[in-house]
């Protein structure tokens, strides 16, 4: 289904808050997994919603993708082999493939229609689909890591939607344990970790669960204006304590001229943890 008339395109949060942009619906369909909507907004350009939740848009997406990708890729011991779970819009792999050190990226996306429609409509976001280092696999990322060989990836990035529908299994301990097994020594796992304002309980649970699986798990924070509350978070986990604080200078020097937001100062500031998050974690631990 497609339509031309400008409309207000809203994400309704818990039937009490709306986040909306005015624009046109370019395409809408229901795949075997979810409702997919492609829009052209007046403020942020073309974008994607899944099950009526904002995922990305051309003039907003760097706020999300740069934060997910660059803290782990500047700090991992090696970045030769990277696994991306989700990320069918192509923005995450675009950022990963900025690094010359990266030799192979495997993108595992459960919904092939997200990839196809993103390639058709969101070319300004997914600019790296033709990179020969990229392998796109349509399938279940949870099942993929269950059967992946031990120590086969240097970095794992989880670019999933909220913990519902096809992404629900990306938020449990068994999945995190498989990711840890699949990582090489010195490897890094990172995932989007919801809004500490709008989804605090989920955010705290993710930190707690990842902290039980990895030697260290640290949340980091930024802004994504089109997401609920605008305040967003990601989680960095590894078995090397303090690794998150040590971006490699050569990688920083190579990446900073290429990107819009990420730099050394942003990296350090992002890991500052709000007091209410600290208190929430302490309360959960008894």
From Swiss-Prot:
Q: In which pathway does it act?
A: Amine and polyamine biosynthesis; spermidine biosynthesis; spermidine from putrescine: step 1/1
Which UniProt key words apply to this protein?
Cytoplasm, Polyamine biosynthesis, Spermidine biosynthesis, Transferase
- CDD domains, per the entry: AdoMet_MTases (cd02440)
Q: Does the keyword Transferase apply?
A: yes
Its signal peptide is none
Q: Residues in the active site?
A: 159 (proton acceptor)
Q: Which GO terms describe its cellular component?
A: cytoplasm
Q: Which PANTHER family match?
A: SPERMIDINE SYNTHASE, SPERMIDINE/SPERMINE SYNTHASE
Describe the protein's quaternary organization and the partners it interacts with. Answer: Homodimer or homotetramer. Homodimer.
Record's protein name: Polyamine aminopropyltransferase
Taxonomic lineage of the native organism: Bacteria, Bacillati, Cyanobacteriota, Cyanophyceae, Synechococcales
């Amino acid at each position: 289904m497609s339509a031309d008339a400008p409309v207000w395109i809203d994400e309704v949060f818990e039937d009490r808050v709306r986040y909306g942009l005015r624009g046109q619906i370019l395409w809408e369909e229901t795949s075997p997994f979810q409702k997919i909507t492609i829009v052209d907004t007046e403020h942020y350009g073309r974008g994607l919603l899944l099950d009526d939740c904002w995922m990305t848009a051309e003039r907003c997406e760097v706020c999300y993708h740069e934060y997910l990708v660059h803290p782990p890729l500047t700090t991992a011991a090696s970045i030769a082999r990277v696994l991306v779970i989700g990320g069918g819009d192509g923005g995450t792999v675009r950022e990963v493939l900025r690094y010359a050190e990266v030799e192979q990226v495997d993108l595992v996306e459960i919904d092939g229609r997200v990839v196809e429609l993103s390639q058709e409509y969101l070319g300004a976001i997914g600019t790296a689909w033709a990179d020969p280092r990229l392998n796109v696999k349509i399938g279940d990322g949870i099942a993929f890591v269950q059967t992946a060989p031990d120590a086969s990836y240097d970095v794992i990035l989880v670019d999933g939607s909220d913990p519902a529908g096809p992404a629900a299994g990306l938020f449990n301990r068994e999945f995190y344990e498989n990711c840890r097994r699949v990582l090489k020594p010195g490897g890094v796992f990172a995932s989007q970790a919801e809004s500490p304002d709008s989804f605090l309980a989920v955010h705290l649970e993710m930190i707690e669960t990842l902290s039980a699986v990895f030697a260290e798990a640290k949340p980091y924070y930024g802004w994504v204006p089109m997401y609920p509350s605008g305040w967003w978070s990601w989680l960095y986990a590894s078995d090397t304590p303090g690794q998150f604080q040590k971006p490699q200078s050569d990688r920083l020097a190579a990446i900073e001229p290429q990107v819009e937001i990420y730099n050394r100062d942003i990296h350090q500031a992002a890991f500052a943890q709000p007091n209410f998050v600290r208190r929430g974690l302490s309360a959960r631990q008894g």
